[in-house]
Design a protein with these regions (language model features):
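Hydrophobic alpha-helical transmembrane segments in integral membrane proteins
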Residues: 91-116, 136-138, 142
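Short, well-ordered helical secondary-structure segments
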Residues: 29, 36, 87, 92-94, ...
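Short amphipathic alpha-helical coupling elements at transmembrane boundaries
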Residues: 37-40, 67, 112, 149, ...
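Non-catalytic terminal accessory segments
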Residues: 1-103
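Low-complexity, intrinsically disordered or weakly predicted helical/coil tracts enriched
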Residues: 70, 74, 106-112, 131
Length: 368
């Protein structure tokens, strides 16, 4: 029996490693429409296969180097038990993250109070979503239709999307216009670009092909009745009072592109006290926004909350915190606020562990 288990174990492991190596070598020869599905599938298999093994080795090593001496009888009980827990528990957690966690949408309800908010906008409801990465859904429209229904039931005044509509390609958008056009808001829908929307993570036959792909992605927003803000702004009026909405192109620390032009986006709205900024990467807030502007509320995405972490009873942790200072939730510095969403889609690992896909409902409040 042990021999059969060993054979199956090593056959699966060697087969998985071989598949990864072959995919790496043959990647450029694969049709682009199949790459995302294959990469995500292998990514999920790799995580679910090697995480339990690594955890088992770590635990056994700790027991070994702690000089704790087991009797032969104890070893026959403890080691298999550790192996069982270290192997099966993470495996089932990962499987749940892939098949359930990635699509278990959660509504986060946030209030943002600010003294400069006009009285006419007191109670104004904003839906904030980000990082759809539509290619990852592999045209499973019904999965995202559930999110659309949840959003519409919240009856928001306005919807903001803060970038990463696709993974790389415009063809990922095929058929999604019928789904996303159903998103409804009382006073409008606005969007910006994220780093993945520029096609920088793919090889192109020519600069013209990349440019054409980029233009198709931008024009998609017309099909779903979203206004794409490219380093520009709009004003919203209620009862002769107004607030401003500005949106910038992607701005992140290297190696991410810095096409966002904050000064140009705010150029025509300096005299409007309450401004909302859409900026995909939250590092932009610390590097430019709070240094040079008086923007009341900035909305960002990008981090995904790493799609893995702990988020229980108001306490949250994720390894992504060691890369991004502002990685999920509401942050405030004096009179300026930043909200970073955990994202609605996924990229790479096809699942979410402890960081559910997020729909954010932000209610603006007038403060004294």
């Amino acid at each position: 029996m042990n021999t059969i288990i060993n054979i199956l174990f090593w056959t699966f492991t060697i087969g998985l490693v071989s598949a990864i190596l072959i995919l790496k070598i043959k990647m450029d020869a694969l049709p682009v429409t199949k790459r995302q599905m294959l990469v995500s599938s292998l990514y999920g298999l790799t995580i679910s296969s090697f995480t339990p093994k690594i955890l088992f080795v770590i635990i056994i090593s700790i027991l070994y180097f702690s000089n704790y001496v087991f009797s032969e009888t104890e070893s026959l009980i403890i080691v298999p038990t550790v192996g069982l827990l270290a192997g099966f528990l993470p495996f089932f957690v990962i499987v749940y993250a892939i098949f359930k966690g990635a699509y278990k949408y959660k509504v986060y309800r946030i209030e943002v109070a600010h003294k400069e908010l006009p009285e006419a906008f007191n109670g104004y409801k904003i839906i904030h979503i980000s990082d759809l990465h539509l290619g990852s859904f592999n045209y499973r429209y019904r999965i995202l239709e559930r999110a659309v229904n949840i959003i519409n039931e919240l009856e928001a005044d306005i919807i903001f999307f803060t970038g990463d509509l696709v993974n790389n390609y415009a063809w990922e958008l095929n058929g999604w216009d019928k789904v996303l056009k159903e998103l409804s808001a009382k006073t409008g829908k606005y969007a910006i670009l994220g780093n993945h929307d520029y096609g920088d993570y793919s090889k192109w036959d020519s600069p013209e092909a990349k440019s054409e792909n980029f233009e198709e992605i931008k024009s998609f927003y017309d099909k779903i009745d979203f206004k794409l803000l490219l380093n520009e702004s709009v004003t919203l009026k209620r009862d002769n009072q107004e607030i401003a909405i500005a949106g910038v192109e992607n701005w992140g620390l290297p190696p991410f592109r810095q096409d966002g032009d904050l000064l140009n986006a705010l150029n025509n709205i300096e005299d409007i006290p309450f401004k909302i900024l859409l900026s995909h990467d939250p590092t932009h807030w610390d590097e430019e926004v709070i240094k040079y502007t008086d923007v009341a509320l900035t909305l960002s995405g990008h981090t995904h909350g790493m799609q893995a972490g702990i988020n229980i009873m108001g306490k949250q942790w994720s390894p992504i915190k060691y890369k991004y200072k502002r990685w999920a939730g509401l942050y405030t510095v004096e009179n300026q606020n930043l909200y970073v969403t955990r994202g609605l889609g996924w990229l790479g690992f096809p699942g979410r562990m402890g960081m559910r896909p997020e729909i954010t409902l932000i209610t603006l409040k007038k403060s004294e």
